Amino acid sequence: TVLFLDADEVPDGRRFTEWLDCSDYRHNTALKLANYWYFREPSNQALRFEDTVVLAQKRALESEILLHQDERDAIYNLLPGPKRRHVAGSDGNPMFHHYSWVRTKEEMLQKVRAWGHKDDRDWVTLVHEEFAAPFRGTDFVHGYSYRAVKPCFEIHFDEIHFEPKGTPQV
């Protein structure tokens, strides 16, 4: 089994491990796992879930699928069933946190100038408008509505901050 996720998609390790131990994921060729989505700050959590993380059976993966331009969507869409989307943890809540748009203004400008959708909209103007005022409760990417939550993880914009946890497994 292979887990496909981006660096800004962070698992709740304990809950994901519990789910792996008690779920029937091996009976599916591919799963899209539900995730929370955040914007601007790690405390701004969308009311709507996404499912960008993919868990796929290694035996079903082929190089054409892995190298497809649609990346994880292709992995899920092109593999045969059985498959499931919006898979949540044992408690019914997402096990992953997606921080794709949790960035400073400068980082967000850098992102929109470089990403594959840069010509879809006038992203630079949207970023400037977004940061001209406090967060308004909706994002300019999807138009999701948000709620304020206590961040699950500390995210520092000023510097890289490593906090040792547990025993090193080296």
Residue ranges: model-predicted function:
Residues 1:
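A conserved donor-nucleotide-binding helix/loop in the catalytic core
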Residues 4, 9-170:
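Catalytic-site signature of metal-activated, phosphate-bearing donor transferases
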